[in-house]
Amino acid sequence: MTDIFEVPTPDNELLEKAKQLRLASIKTSQTNNDDRIRALNLMADYLEKNSKEIIEANIEDYKKAEIKGISKSLLSRLKLSKEKLNLGIEGVRQVGNLIDPVGQIQIKRELSKGLILERKTVPIGVLGVIFESRPDAVMQISSLAIRSGNGVMLKGGSEANLTNLAIVSALKEGLQDSNLDENAICLLTSRKDSMAMLNLEKYINLIIPRGSNELVKFIQENTEIPVLGHADGICHLYIDNEVNLDMALKVALDSKIQYPAACNAVETLLIHKDTASEFLNKAIPMFNSNDVKLIGDKKSFQLGVAFEANYEDWQTEYLDLILSIKIVNDLEEAIAHIQKFSSKHTDGIITENINNANKFMSEIDSSGVFHNCSTRFADGFRYGFGAEVGISTQTLPPRGPVGLEGLVTYKYFLRGEGHIVDDFSSGKLIYSHKDV
């Protein structure tokens, strides 16, 4: 089996798939808004028609994964319940209801009489998306790709191969029925192909890895294709001294236990020293009753946290029912801790002091900074994007949950009437630079 640290040369079969995908993406980029909406509705219809087969495939994948002994967090992401499938199908339809991201005029400017400049949004081209376990991501990513006029090459975790194949088969039926090229969605099933994808710079315009920090860094260092980075989700929640304790506990619980395998689940809880005793007195029994393993610094350990933390805990994304707890002297210490250990995904503060909230949100350089709400809101669907293709923790845009707006770029269109630069250099013509 190909090691993750090998980048093989694409074989002829993969090259042929990439060529077909590239051609299909060009065709998709030329479709109009109504065509793409119709395609999405039909893709959702065929997912519904094939839901029994999709669930059965997932049950088989899950059984095999259990036998292999994969982690609880991966098993949680792998499991596709009927409810989760229905939510995914509804998400496909909702993407169709979003404003068309293609062809939006961002600038329209008269440079001189008869010389008109436009900047318009256009599809990126072909997306290469590598992700782990979550089969519902196939629906999200594919719908966003088609809605934005792109093609997409998908590589999910091998533990979800049967589920992913069943989902992609249904999506392709929808594309066929809508008269769009079914090759606009391409699924790879081997690790060798996923690594060889990194050498497809002639065919792929953007790679979006959704996996471990190790995987993301490796991809960034081993491809000439631009990478939209989504590394670890080491999210923090700071409980201030001016706080409604009941609200703080409710938000902290939701941030950890609502879906602990998610990248936006909180991993470290920071508590002001003046609040710590009263908060932990209420929080420890609640976390214990929800099977959360609490790991704390010496101060929180002395206040009843069961296990003592080490340095590694502050930089660990557990993706499980485990929570690190640290007691801090003040807001400044909380900010310093987050600046040191945060993966720049999502960090939040619980406080009644608006000045403290504003200071926290201004100084924390994460893609999402939250005040008095759960970190679990850091999600494209919850932001109203319809769905997300990934979350970017980089500083340059797109940043945070990436929906449709992150899957288009722009081109400059300049239309003239035989204009030449020399006429402007000589003074025969002048620039008007007037927005129209």
From Swiss-Prot:
One GO location term (cellular component): cytoplasm
SUPFAM superfamilies recorded: ALDH-like
Cellular localisation: Cytoplasm
Pfam families reported for this sequence: Aldedh
Top EC class, one word: oxidoreductase
Alphabetized InterPro entries for the sequence: Ald_DH/histidinol_DH, Ald_DH_C, Ald_DH_N, Aldehyde_DH_dom, G-glutamylP_reductase_CS, Glu-5-SA_DH, GPR_dom
Gene Ontology molecular function terms on file: glutamate-5-semialdehyde dehydrogenase activity; NADP binding
Primary subcellular site in the record, as a coarse category: cytoplasm
Gene Ontology BP terms: L-proline biosynthetic process
Catalytic activity: L-glutamate 5-semialdehyde + phosphate + NADP(+) = L-glutamyl 5-phosphate + NADPH + H(+)
EC assignment: 1.2.1.41
Pathway(s) of this molecule: Amino-acid biosynthesis; L-proline biosynthesis; L-glutamate 5-semialdehyde from L-glutamate: step 2/2
Keyword annotations of the record: Amino-acid biosynthesis, Cytoplasm, NADP, Oxidoreductase, Proline biosynthesis
Domain of life: Bacteria
The family this protein is said to belong to: Belongs to the gamma-glutamyl phosphate reductase family.
Physiological role: Catalyzes the NADPH-dependent reduction of L-glutamate 5-phosphate into L-glutamate 5-semialdehyde and phosphate. The product spontaneously undergoes cyclization to form 1-pyrroline-5-carboxylate.
Protein name as annotated: Gamma-glutamyl phosphate reductase
Organism name: Prochlorococcus marinus subsp. pastoris (strain CCMP1986 / NIES-2087 / MED4)
Gene: proA
